[in-house]
Regions:
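Glycine-rich phosphate-binding loop of ATP-dependent small-molecule kinases
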Residues: 1-187
Length: 187
């Protein structure tokens, strides 16, 4: 019999089982997108501590909300205080990231643009979150003096400090990627 050998294989199997057994809504993602004026997406704002990720995330959520988009700031700390409160210590980082991904998936299924920020999003966490969020798009915005990896948007520390301008840049990118479409588009 098959038995997953790596953490990635185990998570992939869990997601496959979850998706196969998931009780799906009768409302299709396209219908939600039409109603909301946007497609569901997970936006990960990554970077070093003190780089302005939190204020940027809150500004982005607020601006999207003000423009009648369904947005939600899903902070990892809140998930840790709620559904991950039973984990207790920092040795369960993988499980904390998995639970964040599962909560994000619920919001994505409801059609939201989910914004999350953490100092602890490692490459492995991001890959797990992409797997958990599938089929929804995951956008990485990296705030750093020296970017690493291949984020969708890179912002310098100075750019991120001007949260309003940075939020506009992100929204322009989301429009370009056809995530934000406005309330007058047709399917």
């Amino acid at each position: 019999t098959y038995s997953p050998t790596t953490k990635e294989d185990k998570l992939r199997d869990e997601v496959r089982t979850r998706d196969f057994n998931w009780i799906k809504s009768d409302i299709k993602p396209e219908e939600r997108a039409y109603r909301n004026g946007h497609r569901a997406a997970l936006i990960l704002i990554t970077g070093e501590p003190g780089s302005g990720k939190g204020p940027l995330a809150r500004t982005l959520e607020h601006n999207l909300f003000q423009n009648n988009f369904q947005s939600y700031l899903l902070d990892r700390r809140n998930v840790n205080l709620g559904v991950s409160a039973d984990l207790g210590d920092a040795t369960v980082e993988d499980e904390s990231a998995r639970r964040l991904g599962e909560v994000a998936k619920l919001f994505l299924d409801a059609g939201h643009v989910v914004i999350s920020t953490s100092n602890a999003f490692h490459k492995e966490d991001q890959e797990d979150l992409r797997l958990l969020a599938n089929p929804y798009q995951v956008i990485e915005i990296q705030v750093a003096s020296q970017p690493t990896g291949e984020p969708d948007i890179t912002m310098s520390l100075d750019q991120a400090q001007d949260a309003k301008t940075a939020s506009t840049k992100i929204q322009d990118f989301l429009k370009e990627k056809k995530i934000l479409m406005g309330h007058n588009y047709s399917i």
